[in-house]
């Protein structure tokens, strides 16, 4: 066990702590308090009084609360480390001082020694002093056990090092790992910064349905559920795209939604079935303006949490300073493989050339566009360390994007790659309802033939397009991957508070 407590010892510890909770009750003290009035937080005190001299005391009334992370008792003195959300501070507890300030409680110091444990949540009042050894401390006058913990924290030597257990018991992970708390603070700062920027640019956020009658907006396998009263199947959304486009049809010219997406697919360091994305739509612009918006959103987020655009991710120096490199998918593949796929008109000839270049070609590869994408994913994607816009995708893999205005067979689409990973996807949105119907019907045929990720025909969406959708640029950014990048987190599970995990038999956590 990573936390060094056996199942039997855990039961013994729990039983002992239950007894301590009962002892508090017998003294008329509630081991699960209702409130505690707080005047300061630990980090504020550390920063405000960092210049306090050793041995100096400040006549400042302090009331704080937090979790006991460590405790040392030496005769008539005790030193606790208390952690609140902001940080830690030492509690300096003296027998005589507690006796003076807590006369209603017989032998308050001995009771403190007897009934408190690491993990308990404690409230204290007192003044502030720096000990002779230089530790800023709350010089405690009164205390109260606010929550009696029943289970022990992982010991300080081993910590919580089992990765699977860290994800499964995130609440313990957050208690003992300050860097994990910092990751989720930064995640909140990133989403707040993105929303602030869009708000200043005149965008509004509108929530669209999570439960949908049709699954569309991306090539992905949906989760299916059933509405009992209506007697109909429903799908958890795999994208917000089609509903946000309906809003553009309805007259919202700058609209976005930042929210959860659900895809019934595999789990990896980059994929979780439930994840967060932001989709942004702006009328009267194309994918060129969306590239500028992507640069603005990512750099705004980086500045908000790091204060710089030169970052390090997993040991790789990455410069987020715009403008970012732009290269077509055809050009990128040709640079890496020497093959100009735009010259091919025959699929079989192209497959032979790809195979000769070491590109794995699926037997059922249906088109030159799909083959180009296979070549890109295998030979190019992993090389794109610095932020790079890959532009102008094949129409065969982009059923919702507008045809390229000067390159037949391609669409006006880009994806942003950083550290070999896709971070954003964008189109000049397809607004021709006849072309859109044709493409969705082709997707539906693929679905009928067994492709579980192909699009359905969303008749209501097509009806909306027939009322007329203005020229529109659309953008999607994976928030989880952006947070990974800006917090130097190797796995998507590190940036999702409660990632999806396999079922675990009762008790196997220890």
UniProtKB/Swiss-Prot annotation:
Locations listed in the record: Cytoplasm
Q: Which GO terms describe its molecular function?
A: ATP binding; lysine-tRNA ligase activity; magnesium ion binding; tRNA binding
What the record notes about the co-factor is:
Binds 3 Mg(2+) ions per subunit.
List, in alphabetical order, the GO biological process terms annotated in this UniProt record: lysyl-tRNA aminoacylation
Transmembrane spans: none
The positions making up the signal sequence are: none
Q: What is its main location?
A: cytoplasm
Catalysed reactions listed for this entry:
tRNA(Lys) + L-lysine + ATP = L-lysyl-tRNA(Lys) + AMP + diphosphate
| A Pfam entry, by short name | tRNA-synt_2
Annotated positions binding Mg(2+) 1: 415, 422
Q: Which cofactor does it need?
A: Mg(2+)
User: Carries keyword Metal-binding?
Assistant: yes
Q: What family is this?
A: Belongs to the class-II aminoacyl-tRNA synthetase family.
What protein does this entry describe?
Lysine--tRNA ligase
What is the native source organism of this protein? Synechocystis sp. (strain ATCC 27184 / PCC 6803 / Kazusa)
Which lineage do the record's taxonomy fields give for this organism? Bacteria, Bacillati, Cyanobacteriota, Cyanophyceae, Synechococcales
Q: Which gene encodes it?
A: lysS
């Amino acid at each position: 066990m990573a936390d060094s407590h056996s199942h039997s010892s855990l039961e013994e510890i729990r039983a002992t702590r239950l007894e301590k909770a009962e002892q508090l009750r017998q003294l008329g003290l509630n081991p699960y308090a209702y409130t505690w009035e707080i005047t300061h937080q630990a980090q504020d005190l550390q920063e405000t009084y960092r210049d306090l001299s050793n041995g100096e005391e400040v006549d400042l009334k302090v009331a704080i609360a937090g979790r006991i992370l460590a405790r040392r008792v030496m005769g008539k003195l005790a030193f606790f480390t208390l952690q609140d959300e902001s940080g830690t501070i030492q509690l300096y507890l003296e027998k005589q001082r507690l006796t003076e300030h807590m006369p209603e409680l017989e032998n308050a110091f001995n009771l403190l020694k007897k009934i408190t444990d690491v993990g308990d949540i404690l409230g204290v009042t007192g003044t502030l002093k720096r000990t002779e050894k230089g530790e800023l401390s709350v010089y405690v006058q009164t205390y109260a056990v606010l929550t009696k913990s029943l289970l022990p924290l992982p010991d300080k030597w081993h910590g919580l090092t089992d990765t699977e257990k860290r994800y499964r018991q995130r609440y313990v992970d957050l208690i003992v790992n300050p860097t994990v708390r910092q990751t989720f603070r930064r995640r909140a700062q990133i989403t707040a910064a993105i929303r602030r920027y869009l708000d200043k640019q005149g965008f509004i956020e509108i929530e669209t349905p999570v439960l949908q009658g049709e699954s569309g907006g991306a090539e992905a396998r949906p989760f299916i559920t059933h509405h009992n009263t209506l007697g109909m199947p429903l799908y958890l959304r795999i994208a917000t795209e089609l509903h946000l486009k309906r809003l553009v049809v309805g007259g919202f010219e700058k609209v976005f939604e930042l929210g959860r997406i659900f895809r019934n697919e595999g789990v990896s360091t980059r994929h979780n079935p439930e994840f967060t994305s932001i989709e942004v739509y702006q009328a009267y612009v194309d994918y060129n303006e969306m590239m500028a918006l992507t640069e603005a959103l990512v750099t705004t987020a980086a500045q908000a949490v790091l204060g710089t655009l030169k970052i390090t991710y997993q040991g790789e120096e990455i410069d987020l300073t715009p403008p970012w490199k732009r290269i077509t998918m055809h050009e990128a593949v040709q640079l890496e493989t020497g093959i100009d796929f735009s010259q091919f008109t025959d699929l079989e000839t192209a497959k032979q050339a790809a195979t000769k270049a070491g590109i794995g070609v699926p037997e059922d590869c249906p088109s030159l566009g799909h083959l180009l994408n296979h070549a890109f994913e295998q030979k190019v994607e992993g090389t794109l360390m610095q932020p790079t816009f890959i532009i102008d995708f094949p129409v065969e893999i982009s059923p919702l994007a507008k045809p390229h205005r000067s390159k037949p067979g391609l669409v006006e689409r880009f994806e942003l790659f950083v550290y070999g990973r896709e971070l954003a996807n964008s189109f000049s949105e397809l607004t021709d309802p006849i072309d859109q119907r044709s493409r969705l019907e082709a997707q539906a045929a693929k679905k009928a033939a067994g492709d579980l990720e192909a699009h359905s025909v969303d008749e209501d969406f097509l009806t909306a397009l027939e009322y007329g959708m203005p020229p529109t640029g659309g953008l999607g950014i994976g928030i989880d991957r952006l947070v990974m990048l800006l917090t130097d987190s190797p796995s998507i599970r590190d940036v999702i508070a409660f990632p999806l995990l396999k079922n675990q038999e009762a008790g196997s956590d220890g």
